[in-house]
Amino acid sequence: MSERGIKWACEYCTYENWPSAIKCTMCRAQRPSGTIITEDPFKSGSSDVGRDWDPSSTEGGSSPLICPDSSARPRVKSSYSMENANKWSCHMCTYLNWPRAIRCTQCLSQRRTRSPTESPQSSGSGSRPVAFSVDPCEEYNDRNKLNTRTQHWTCSVCTYENWAKAKRCVVCDHPRPNNIEAIELAETEEASSIINEQDRARWRGSCSSGNSQRRSPPATKRDSEVKMDFQRIELAGAVGSKEELEVDFKKLKQIKNRMKKTDWLFLNACVGVVEGDLAAIEAYKSSGGDIARQLTADEVRLLNRPSAFDVGYTLVHLAIRFQRQDMLAILLTEVSQQAAKCIPAMVCPELTEQIRREIAASLHQRKGDFACYFLTDLVTFTLPADIEDLPPTVQEKLFDEVLDRDVQKELEEESPIINWSLELATRLDSRLYALWNRTAGDCLLDSVLQATWGIYDKDSVLRKALHDSLHDCSHWFYTRWKDWESWYSQSFGLHFSLREEQWQEDWAFILSLASQPGASLEQTHIFVLAHILRRPIIVYGVKYYKSFRGETLGYTRFQGVYLPLLWEQSFCWKSPIALGYTRGHFSALVAMENDGYGNRGAGANLNTDDDVTITFLPLVDSERKLLHVHFLSAQELGNEEQQEKLLREWLDCCVTEGGVLVAMQKSSRRRNHPLVTQMVEKWLDRYRQIRPCTSLSDGEEDEDDEDE
């Protein structure tokens, strides 16, 4: 044998290597081994299913439901030995089995019996072609490709030359055309992998009737007309006829063809709940998907995991079943928000963008050691008093679209956290309303801007200022945070000490949260936001984390007063804003405009201007305990009297006739920003247009009464 004949050709670069080499000397590719096709039937089977279910057309990116195998490459046999010539080829996976085997070793398919019409040459190896004595090294030579073309068939889709024994293209999985009709179908077929079911049926019929030598002759039954193109390896060995498998495949194919982008995102979100992937849920929510959507029978069949998915399940059901507490906090809040919402920022996008530019222009960085960002304008958002002039039905519709009813109910009814004092809520017109906003980690920033300017932090302007302030003033905020965390732990009897490296790691994590859009924020970030606003922030929130069963999991630690303690008092405003906290979600708490009162609190020096709205925010809880002041230094910590004195220094405080210590929030429509006023008016006009229809109907009823 010549030197050229004993070498083996690399299937990638065609370099001829010595027989002792196990890898290609040039490209380091693995040497092909064996006399059968080197593509594992199990891999090829899963690859077929993966390609059929490939969601690339949905633009949803990678999916845990789809596992395509795009790494399949053609493998070439080096030679045909006499030993392999006696083997028979499986008609399903083309694996070469020993002559004595009655079933395929790989896929367990039944060996076909010898047909009377088959020639002796084809009976031993099924559909395996006669071996040609062609040097495998010379086969990759461009000059000799024409001589070996008889061993290959060219795919009509990707033009790859496949071995004669291959029933489907190794590269694109396109079926091999066997006659003129099938070739015409292949030419008119779309380039995508989605195959029309009628064309597939025609192709099967033509193959079963026009290729009697390649396949067994048609039986008395019509089994050959519904023969499968390929077999799912996981179903090989399962009890059931080929007709049932074919029907199952066609059903899955039809389901997949009906799937849209939102459907794939929903299935990925379901898998994300099971596997703990929050990103899949966020992707589904951001696409506008319905959180309360239920799994259908077809979707459960496509997921193919009965132990996890069942018909009628929603994302909430799956989160409960797999105990995803963090996801439940988001999903339960989102389910209640399926009603159409219409807040002022949504009505006029042009005005909203102008307000965002105004906020960005009013952000400045203070010069000096404490280089924190701050806002130059004092703006407080309130609901317009004109709402009370609308008919009751229109008012109800307005509140449904602008308020978060679930948050309002939890803070008012389930726990007396806000509006627990009839004196404040009724007589002093200081009832607080929870505005609806986005969920996830941006809710704190959204609620802060809603309580001031009435818009979202859509462009992350406030988040960027938060991150830059934390980064540039890291030493100042780090000292306050470290002292406060140490004191808070000791107040609960937890006496421990951490190394400085551990403190630094925790602080680095807090810094990283501020820079990531959508990341949840903590108490430290509220403290920094109070400095950016240059005004106090009062948080009214639930005291305990609870599971969906109502079990207490721990303290929330958010409720309390956050003062801009690192600024000079003369540089800050004393009018606070109020936020609500429930189930990992922040909401802006705003009041409704009133006409102002002269002397409603003991020791209060109120502005008598009728245009000024004064809202009384309690500084005690329903049990008359003083709210905690967060991030106090060791010198500022003291008893309740000392903390009350500190609150009076930073806030305009007074005591009501009922003995409730309150802080006064002052706002004025005339002094408010004109863009905010214009935005609110446009939003209110939307509901004023509903009024004439209701008024006309009432008038008609009155006329009918007069006639009677």
Curated annotation (Swiss-Prot):
Residues 38-73, 200-225 are annotated as: Disordered. It is an enzyme of class 3 (hydrolase). Zn(2+) 2 binds at residues 90, 93, 104, 107. Signal peptide: none annotated. One of its GO terms (molecular function) is K63-linked polyubiquitin modification-dependent protein binding. Residues 432-592 form the OTU domain. Changing residue 26 to A: Abolished binding to 'Lys-29'- and 'Lys-33'-linked ubiquitin. Residues 392-641 are annotated as: TRAF-binding. One of its GO terms (cellular component) is cytosol. Its main location: cytoplasm. ANK repeats lie at residues 260-290, 313-340. A zinc finger (RanBP2-type) spans 3-33, 84-113, 149-178. Changing residue 18 to A: Abolished binding to 'Lys-33'-linked diubiquitin. It is found in: Cytoplasm; Nucleus. Interacts with TRAF6. Interacts with APC. This is Ubiquitin thioesterase ZRANB1. It comes from Homo sapiens (Human). The lineage of its organism: Eukaryota, Metazoa, Chordata, Craniata, Vertebrata.
